[in-house]
Regions:
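Preference for long, amphipathic alpha-helical scaffolds in soluble/luminal domains
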Residues: 1-194
Length: 194
């Protein structure tokens, strides 16, 4: 048996040993702080934050901030602009004041890394939804393009994988409608220079 075959066998054994008797795996989903910041955003938008443990989200976001004011995509990357903006947004939506040291340091990092205009599209999308970024700064594909015959359409959703279609089609509609749900904190955050 080759070294590769033995390595594959060992990896399979480790994975199968962790499988539950019902056939699935149960483990912690590890990610960066964007999942938490986005959950805060959704709960604030839907008004479901009142009966949720938002204090845990606040603690989690604060505890994962780096000394340079940023939040990382992965451990040791030195800080990621988009993730730092989303964490900042999450903290503001949770009521953290703009003059608190964690946000002052975050703002310094964000500005030194280029600010919102250099962030990823999804970060800008989250900010646009709460009125803190202009929808005109986001690229969009009009949803009606899906109605064009394939022969003349520059784009067909069937060129995308099934999982990509599942998120692209709804996003095309949202980008077309350009909704803005301003929360009080969202309005206050919009006046900040980040």
């Amino acid at each position: 048996m080759s070294l590769l075959d033995r390595a594959i066998e060992k990896a399979q054994a480790v994975l199968l040993a962790q499988q539950t008797p019902n056939g699935y795996w149960w483990a912690t989903l590890e990610s960066n702080v964007t999942m938490t910041a986005e959950a805060v955003l959704l709960h604030k938008l839907y008004g479901t934050d009142v009966d949720r443990p938002m204090g845990k989200a606040l603690t989690y976001l604060r505890n994962h901030q780096c000394k340079n004011g940023s939040w990382e995509l992965y451990k040791g990357d030195g800080g990621n602009l988009s993730i730092s903006i989303e964490a900042y947004m999450g903290l503001r939506l949770l009521g953290v004041a703009i003059d608190e040291p964690c946000l002052v340091n975050a703002r310094e990092f964000i500005l030194s890394a280029g600010g919102i205009t250099k962030a990823r599209i999804f970060t800008k999308f989250h900010l646009a939804v709460i009125g803190c970024y202009d929808w005109r700064g986001l690229p969009s594909i009009p949803p009606w393009i899906m109605l064009l015959p394939n022969q003349i359409s520059p784009f067909t959703i069937y060129e995308l994988s099934s999982w990509a279609r599942g998120s692209t089609v709804p996003l095309m509609v949202v980008f077309d409608r350009k909704p803005v749900w301003l929360t009080e904190i969202g309005r206050a955050s919009c006046r900040e220079r980040v």
